[in-house]
Structure formats: C-alpha cells, structure tokens
Amino acid sequence: EYGYISVADAGVLSFHSPLVFSFDYTWQTAFNILFNSNVVFAIFLLIVLAPVFSEEYSSGAANVILSTRYGKSKVIQAKFTAAFLIAAISAVIFCVVILLACGAYFAGFEGWNADIQTQFMSNQSQIPIRMNNLQFFLVVMLFYWLSAVGTAVLACCCSALCKKSLIALIMSGVLYFLPYFPMKLGGVLGEWMFIFPIWSAKAQWVLRTAEHKLVNLLPLSCEMPVWIVIFTLIFTVVSFL
C-alpha cells in the first residue's frame, strides 16, 4: 500500500525547536556505510598489527632487542605507540574517505546542517540527542577512533603473547568477535558489550540503545559513551605496563 507518511507516523522525535530538513543523501549514505563496515576496518587493523611483536619471535630478532639496554622499555613502548598511531590515523582517514566518496557520488555535501532525526527509518533517526549531520559525523569518527585504539590494544597484546603472526591474527580475531554473541542476548550484559571494539564503533546503536541514560557500575554512574572512553583508556594504559 502506498501513500503519504506524516512526521508522526515516521516516529520522529520532538524537540523544543523545529527540525531542519534538507537533501542529505551524502551524509545518510556515509553513515550507513560506516555503520556496516566497522568489522571490515577492524580486520584490516588486525592483519596489519598482528605481526608487530610475533614477527620478531619468528625471525629471532626478539632475543637481540630484549638483550639491549632499552629493549624491554623504549623499543616495546615505541611499537605500542606506533600501533596506536596507525590505528588512530587509519580510523580518521577511513571515515573521511567514505564521506568524500559519498560527496563525490551525490555531488556535494548539502544537508550538513540537517538534523539526523529527519533521516526516516535510519539507525540514527531515533537517537534522542539532537545533532546535525556534520556534528554526528564527528561523533561517528570519534567512536571509530576509540574502536580502532581498542582493536590496536587487542592486536598488540595477542602479538606479544604469540610467536607466530598467523596465530596472533587468529587469536585476536576470535577475541574481537567474542562480544558479538552476548550482545544478541540483550539485557544488561548485552548493553555492556558496547565497551568492546566490535560494538563501540556503531555510534548509532551506542547512542540509541543506551537511550542517553546512566549506566551503573559501582561506585560510578555514567552514560555508555563515557564508559567506552573510560574502558578504552584503561585498556590502553594497561597495555603499556
């Protein structure tokens, strides 16, 4: 059955001031691609970063490095830092390239100031925080950045524990996908899966599923995006120890 659909029928959230509508296919398409391609991007990072330490074991260079004066500190920290920089910069480049490609295909970036809630039936239409497309793109890029850093931590830790790059890749891949299944169970356990890289990159679900509410973990009570930042920071600091 075909016909007109009203704003109320589309379930658009109401705010104190009118929503801004515009042609925003560039932004909506970019958001959809980024939402669905975070796993592909993570696999790329795992492949690139898996040999960071394990390659040294297989080549015998580890014994030489660890026997030097700064082998156990400077060299290892430098490798972790390089891995984080690769992940962080790659995340920004990936997001920007996707947006530029969509802008080139749809002939521009019109609608940057349109509210994301006007993108009917999209993952971002039910986010209870009012943002325009440009603001939300920056938020998506931030969550991609956090997810990339978390993925880098995982890859480096597995690489340090394994003597072969292939085993490190498989191990990091299994651990990366492990939180996928508890999320499907829903409930409190499922909600906490957002702190892991496989889910933290999906900004639409992080902001919508958490419904901008406080999540308790005694003695702290924070919103889920804040928890993602906290746990990513903790994982990063621990990896340097």
Report residues per predicted region:
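Secretory targeting signals
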Residues: 4-56, 77-161, 172, 180-183, ...
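Short helix-to-coil transition segments within interhelical loops
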Residues: 66-72
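Transmembrane helix irregularities
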Residues: 68, 161-162
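Membrane-helix interface/capping residues of multi-pass secondary transporters
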Residues: 72, 164-165
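Junction motif at the cytosolic side of a transmembrane helix
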Residues: 157-161, 230-241
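Central hydrophobic cores of alpha-helical transmembrane segments
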Residues: 166-179, 195-198
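A cytosolic-side transmembrane-helix exit/cap motif
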Residues: 187-195
